[in-house]
Amino acid sequence: VGEDNAQMYYTLTYKNRPVIEESKLGVLIENQLFESALGVPNDTCHFWCENLKLTGTERRKADETWKPVYGERAEIRDCYNEMTLKFKKGEGDGAQEGGYDKRKNYFMNIIVRAYNEGVAFRYHFPETTNGLFLHIIGEQTSFTMPQGTMAYYERWAQGPYALRPLEGWGKEESERPLTLKLPDGLSVALLEAEMVDYARGKFRLSADKPSTLETSLYSSVDIISPYSTPWRVIMVGERPVDLIN
């Protein structure tokens, strides 16, 4: 979290080699119309995820297998360490998970899974006794890559690839998954998984921060808790072939 407690950040390294430099986390939510209809004072934060309070963490390990409907392998191992970061927004009545009395409080979790092959994270809004409406207009999720990273840019699905630096894209967006070639030789893939009732995301270059990819949603999304956004996945390999093995 930044010094002003207004922005969440993350970094990622692989064997002490930088993969993702300090990058933003967060969901952009506009609930003013909904809150006004309920007589609840509007949120005055510039970004919805400002001033979230960390209330607890949970950790667990998983090592299991599942069988795909089709594919090259009969079974796939799913082995990871998971941490859930629990946040609360707001004070006053109903300040407990599952309550949301008078809509003065919101709860959001960030679920992070660490695999040998990379990292996945998502935003989760817990179940409540009376449901909770959220109007998501975007994400702050970004990926700041080491200077000199090259991207296998693809403007649309099944389109031609072009190896391009992380600059000069203008307003163009790249499809996912997006494969990247880091200057130290590592190969990285950015992708999403388990997208249910959500807008597809692409990658665009930040206008303010060099070598930074931002998550660009096709449209806004209306959800009711409980709800989980798609996984944002970062795969890392010593060689390009490691990303598919």
Predicted segments with their positions:
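N-terminal accessory beta-strand-rich subdomains and adjacent acidic, glycine-rich linkers
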Residues: V1-N245
